[in-house]
Amino acid sequence: MLMITSFANPRVAQAFVDYMATQGVILTIQQHNQSDVWLADESQAERVRAELARFLENPADPRYLAASWQAGHTGSGLHYRRYPFFAALRERAGPVTWVMMIACVVVFIAMQILGDQEVMLWLAWPFDPTLKFEFWRYFTHALMHFSLMHILFNLLWWWYLGGAVEKRLGSGKLIVITLISALLSGYVQQKFSGPWFGGLSGVVYALMGYVWLRGERDPQSGIYLQRGLIIFALIWIVAGWFDLFGMSMANGAHIAGLAVGLAMAFVDSLNARKRK
């Protein structure tokens, strides 16, 4: 099967599927974060994409509405899935996403009980030459958060972006992005501020860059990030760099993470194009 496109609005997706059915082409919809349209007979891909281009120019054209009437999908037959809060969390997060979230929460609780300094002595970037072979330190700095707002903000983005990557591209891809971005963003940040820093934001920015550029260059990957959100991320970096909000931010980690994510997305999308 071949994924043709994704629609944010499930009714629009259904309208296109109904119209193609009247043209003798069977498409199916799979609901994830968006409504993904799949084609079973890949020999019809060129024809479907041509029709999709015409559809996107004017989805409200009467012929599409007529097709929906013919297929019987204009009423309330389209069912929207409703999830309780925790069910929604489970639906959009794979095992790696969950393990990271749980690890961050456990470390945060430990920091509240034992104190920041005690936990940092074990998890911070190597702050002494004798610690350079304690390899976990190059990654575990990402688990430490210093306020409730800090951890909530990072874990929300981690769940949203990391969950999408894991669901679409697999746990292995999320692990690779996480490890590389934690290592490189941590390296850059310690050059800026020394070893006493923490937080998942370097990884989050890597995921932002990765999901946005991979979605732009390889829509069939099934991941995407609205351009408004990547613009927000850039504004946040600028605000942090110039200390506009009076908050201590790991600016080096943010910039390095974003660069890592963009670079990995460029390489992966290039490889995806070569395979076609």
Curated annotation (Swiss-Prot):
It is found in: Cell inner membrane. The chain crosses the membrane at residues 94-114, 142-162, 169-189, 192-212, 223-245, 250-272. Residues 1-93, 163-168, 213-222, 273-276 are cytoplasmic. Its EC number is 3.4.21.105. GO terms for biological process: proteolysis. The active site is at 201 (nucleophile), 254. It comes from the Bacteria. Residues 115-141, 190-191, 246-249 are periplasmic. Keywords: Cell inner membrane, Cell membrane, Hydrolase, Membrane, Protease, Serine protease, Transmembrane, Transmembrane helix. It catalyses: Cleaves type-1 transmembrane domains using a catalytic dyad composed of serine and histidine that are contributed by different transmembrane domains. It is a multi-pass membrane protein. GO terms for molecular function: endopeptidase activity; identical protein binding; serine-type endopeptidase activity. One of its GO terms (cellular component) is plasma membrane. InterPro entries: GlpG_N_sf, Peptidase_S54_GlpG_N, Peptidase_S54_rhomboid_dom, Rhomboid-like_sf, Rhomboid_protease_GlpG. The loop between transmembrane domains 5 and 6 is flexible and may readily open to the extracellular side to allow water entry into the active site cavity. HAMAP family: Rhomboid_GlpG. Belongs to the peptidase S54 family. Rhomboid-type serine protease that catalyzes intramembrane proteolysis. This is Rhomboid protease GlpG. The gene is glpG.
